[in-house]
A protein has these predicted regions:
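Jelly-roll (double-stranded beta-helix
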Residues: 1-272
């Protein structure tokens, strides 16, 4: 449990994928599988904490999340929406179940990614992108819909601005339908099955499971056994040193020590 509102399973860099570079530029994937929270007058979540050197990407599948940060950004995302926070040089933030959702209770399902920043951008100015479902790029095909959050597919671009080449899609497949995705062979690619069960290259992958691909081809065929949703991640590796310490993701221990010092000296701003 992260805080008291995010009941998560970590797929990487823990579990069976301990190599911190294996899904670069994606460093971490925490998945809050569907879980029913009872009504509460207190908003569950994660209180104020710092980040530096990367981006947090929260994707809502069920439930609502409220965000506040020390750069003055705030917002609420619901089903199908995304918040993309660039911590970069340093920010404080907090994430909670949205007030009305907390009071009524309901099923909560989310993904949070940590996307590493190239060394040259780690100390850039923090920013916040709130991406509503209706603003995402859409590739409709006979068997369903591909929503492009970041990157592009067949010249359809996603709205998220990124610092390195990467793709983040939500793939929705109708029962017994399939799609063959064309993705760069040199990109690190993985897929999380959010709903339903699918065969990926003839291997069965059930809901709440993650499929990691070898970098040896450009075509991946996914076929739904039932109505299915998948999160597709594909990105060009950064091939830079990674040093992770708590909420900081840098390129050296000296930079980590500086991040800790700057945080302790109040340089990440103020957030109540």
């Amino acid at each position: 449990m992260v805080g008291d509102g995010f009941r998560v399973h970590n797929f990487f860099p823990a579990a069976g994928i301990q190599n911190k570079q294996r899904m670069s530029p994606f460093f971490m994937l925490d998945y809050a599988s569907p879980y029913h929270f009872p009504p509460s007058e207190t908003q569950r979540g994660v209180d104020v904490h710092p980040h530096r050197g990367f981006e947090t990407v929260t994707i809502a599948y069920q439930g609502k999340v409220a965000h506040h940060d020390s750069a003055g950004n705030h917002g609420v995302i619901g089903e199908g929406d995304v918040q993309w926070m660039t911590a970069a040089s340093g920010v404080l933030h907090k994430e909670y179940h949205e007030k009305d959702f907390s009071q009524k209770g309901g099923t909560f399902q989310m993904v949070q990614l940590w996307v590493n920043l190239p060394a040259q951008y780690k100390m850039t100015t923090p920013r916040y992108q709130e991406i509503k479902k209706e603003k995402m790029g859409q590739h409709a095909f006979e068997g369903g819909m591909l929503e492009i959050i970041a990157g592009e597919y067949r010249e359809i671009k996603g709205p998220a601005q990124t610092f390195s080449p990467l793709n983040v899609y939500n793939l929705h497949l109708n029962p017994s339908k399939e799609i063959t995705l064309e993705l760069p062979a040199e990109f690190n690619t993985g897929m999380l099955v959010i709903k339903g069960s699918v065969t990926i290259e003839d291997q069965l992958v059930s809901a709440d499971h993650f499929a990691l691909f070898q970098n040896n081809g450009t075509s991946i065929t996914i076929k739904a056994k039932e109505s299915a949703t998948l999160l597709v991640l594909s990105g060009q590796p950064l091939n830079e040193p990674i040093v992770a310490y708590g909420p900081f993701l840098m390129n050296s221990w000296e930079e980590i020590e500086q991040a800790v010092e700057d945080f302790n000296n109040g340089k990440f701003g103020v957030l109540d």
